[in-house]
Swiss-Prot record:
Intervals of motif Interaction with polymerase core subunit RpoC: 486-489
Biased composition annotated in UniProt, kind: Acidic residues: 276-291
Annotated Gene Ontology cellular component terms: cytoplasm
Cytoplasm recorded as keyword: yes
The protein's name in its UniProt record: RNA polymerase sigma factor RpoD
Chain intervals for the UniProt region annotation (Sigma-70 factor domain-3): 541-617
Molecular function via GO: DNA binding; sigma factor activity
Length: 698
């Protein structure tokens, strides 16, 4: 007796039908892009259900018929109407959901997905690039990377293993398919993604902080295998001590397992202070007091002396017994345990790991060069090269052995032998410079990369779980010159700094510590970016204090505070108060619309002091015209003398001697002509025309 199954059940394996053959007719509607086939059932035959499985565009939909239980065969029904036929949309959605499930299950097992497989599975409705980006984003969040081509084993070496779970896959399918219908508003998308992460308890914060610490210690333990880095670190410490530099540039502190985990005194007071000071403090509210002052010099000196002692023993053991000797490994382990307790500054940490990466890049560059000559140019099989070359990077006899193994390509290998030997010599030189062989360089970098990845994942979890804290603090700083999204972005930067410097052993909750860093980042960004004209941070603090006292006076008296009152309250000279009030004014755009119709700008009403006013221009024009008219009543000689003497219609005036040379007479004669012309102009008939201009000038 066959078991009862739903009519829409789908089988993922091919099954042969038993009993009577079912008549199946498939009719595809052109509007359906998933290429699923509908089923029409014959009236006299048992009902059957078709199942379609879509693998790719190249494979046709496969139809499998399956007989229904006998209870369904007793009452053959009439041919179904259009309304009774299966809904194509529902079948397409179900098939699409199941197809996604199979794809995600396979992708989670492999850890990646190929872009072509994703496109083949999606219907044509998902051809929009924005929708495709959204789906790829959701897959990335699930831990599934999308590649253009299948990655090699090295790319997946550090990836975490993923486990397939039916319920989890079904949830992931729903999330991916829902991506298309979600909003594209960035704020809503950010809020939705932020809300999907659960808040952390105190215990959860400690667990993540320990994971961060474990990853950092793993990196520090790997660094010890490269002795030159330890020696360089010791030299930098000696330089800082000799020059009285800042220890915080080198160290933040030390990981101490025995450090007290008791709660600090009155953390509630600090929380309250953080909340009350959010409103008015505009400076570096969360200053760099957390982790920036550096460790205690005496404690640091003790740790460094111990480090120097262990490093000296390790170097002596290498010289006496060699790197692989048990005694040397014992000293190396002790050195690694001590050095892993050092909490380096971010700059110093990146400097040490950066040197290791540069070594690896140099080695990889030479290896790729050798592989290019052997595989690409000499046409030797890639698998043979990968099997033969490792552990023979600097073996100068390897090429001869490789030619014997590949006799068909021996001539081509001989052609590029000089280049291959040169690359091997470069690798040997790299080993000699760093006292490490190529395999050791790769192993150190592998351990460093794993430790960094572990620490980075834990930091990401801590940051995502505390994004709500940034929102709550950023809300208090709106309408201060920066948009809300910019405030969130700056607050998130402060949150990331807080995660880097958080010390769970002090007993504080992370939110108590991070609040100061978030506030500091937001207020600093407001001071730097909000104003068109940047004002120093200390002046911003003075302005905020002035505004706060001004509001208090207004609430107490109901009258705006005068500069004298503000000066008395702030113990500040009145002149400085006026200067601060002047600086506090915000610039206004000259393009600001004015009036109800907004048909004019503010710049149209601002006086241009460099331009002559219309009244002065009209007066000057009238005076010039009247002067020319009066001069026309004189003789040409007298008029020209006056014009030259007073610079009328000329660039400049002239002396008596200059005018005399012009007329070829003495300067005394020019003075007489000038005096006679001026007496004529003083006549009332002529002077009357100039009286009005004299009154205006007065």
């Amino acid at each position: 007796m066959p078991s009862r199954k739903k009519k829409s059940s789908v089988t993922k394996t091919k099954k042969k039908t038993t009993g009577k053959k079912a008549r199946v007719t498939a009719k595809a509607k052109p509007s359906v892009k998933s290429k699923l086939k509908t089923v029409k059932r014959a009236p006299a035959k048992p009902k059957s259900v078709t199942v379609a499985k879509t693998k790719s565009k190249k494979e046709k939909a496969k139809v499998v018929s399956q007989p229904l239980p006998k209870t369904a065969e007793k009452k053959p029904s009439a041919p179904p109407s259009e309304t009774q036929q299966p809904k194509i949309g529902e079948n397409a959605a179900e098939s699409q959901r199941l197809g996604f499930g199979a794809l995600l299950e396979e992708a989670k097992n492999k850890g990646y997905l190929v872009h072509e497989d994703l496109i083949n599975l999606l219907p044509n409705d998902y051809a929009d690039p924005s929708q495709m980006e959204g789906i790829i984003g959701r897959l990335t969040e699930m831990g599934i990377k999308v590649f253009e081509i299948p990655p090699d084993a090295d790319s997946l070496l550090l990836e975490e293993d993923t486990q397939s779970d039916d319920d989890e896959i079904n949830e992931d399918v729903a999330e991916v398919l829902a991506t298309e219908t979600r909003t594209t508003d960035p704020v809503r998308m950010y809020m939705r993604e932020m809300g999907s992460v659960e808040l952390l308890t105190r215990e959860g914060e400690i667990v993540i902080a320990k994971r961060i610490e474990e990853g950092i210690r793993q990196v520090m333990g790997a660094v010890v295998q490269y002795p030159e880095l330890i020696e360089k670190f010791i030299k930098e410490y000696d330089t800082i001590v000799a020059t009285e530099g800042r220890l915080s540039d080198l160290l933040i502190g030390f990981f101490d397992e025995e450090e007290s985990t008791a709660s600090p005194v009155a953390p509630e007071a600090r929380d309250k202070e953080a909340e009350t000071s959010d409103e008015d403090d505009g400076g570096e509210g969360g200053s760099d007091e957390f982790g920036e002052s550096g460790p205690d010099p005496l404690i640091t000196q003790q740790h460094m002396e111990e480090l120097k002692k262990l490093y000296g023993r390790y170097q002596n053991a290498i010289k006496r017994y060699g790197k692989k000797a048990p005694a040397t490994l014992k000293h190396q382990k002790a050195l690694a345990e001590l050095f892993s307790t050092f909490k380096l500054s971010i700059k110093q940490f990146n400097r040490l790991t950066g040197q290791l990466r540069r070594m690896l890049r140099a080695a990889r560059a030479q290896e790729r060069l050798i592989m290019s000559y052997c595989v690409v140019k000499a046409k030797t099989p890639r698998k043979k090269f990968i099997a033969s070359f490792p552990h023979n990077e600097t073996n100068m006899k390897w090429l001869e052995q490789y030619k014997n193994e590949n006799k068909e390509q021996a001539k081509r290998l001989e052609k590029y032998s000089k280049e291959i030997y040169r690359a091997q010599r470069n690798l040997a030189q790299l080993e000699e410079q760093n006292n490490l062989n190529i395999q050791e360089i790769k192993e150190i970098n592998r351990r460093v990369a794993i430790g960094e990845a572990k620490s980075r994942r834990a930091k990401k979890e801590m940051i995502e779980a505390n994004l709500r804290l940034v929102i709550s603090i950023a809300k208090k700083y709106t309408n201060r010159g920066l948009q809300f999204l910019d405030l969130i972005q700056e607050g998130n930067i402060g949150l990331m700094k807080a995660v880097d410097k958080f010390e769970y052993r002090r007993g504080y909750k992370f939110s108590t510590y991070a609040t100061w860093w978030i506030r500091q980042a937001i207020t600093r960004s407001i001071a730097d970016q909000a104003r068109t004209i940047r004002i120093p941070v200390h002046m911003i603090e003075t302005i905020n204090k002035l505004n706060r006292i001004s509001r208090q006076i207004l609430q107490e008296t109901g009258i705006e505070a005068t500069p004298e009152e503000l000066g008395r309250r702030m113990d500040m000279p009145e002149e400085k108060v006026r200067k601060v009030l002047k600086i506090a004014k915000e610039p206004i755009s000259m393009e600001t619309p004015i009036g109800e119709d907004e048909d004019s700008n503010l710049g149209d009403f601002i006086e241009d002091i460099n331009m002559e006013s219309p009244v002065d221009f009209a007066t000057s024009a009238g005076l010039m015209e009247a002067t020319r008219e009066i001069l026309s009543t004189l003789t040409p000689r007298e008029a020209k003398v006056l014009r030259m003497r007073f610079g009328i219609d000329m660039n400049t005036d002239h002396t008596l001697e200059e005018v005399g040379k012009q007329f070829d007479v003495t300067r005394e004669r020019i003075r007489q002509i000038e005096a006679k012309a001026l007496r004529k102009l003083r006549h009332p008939s002529r002077a009357e025309k100039l009286h009005s201009f004299i009154e205006v000038e007065e």
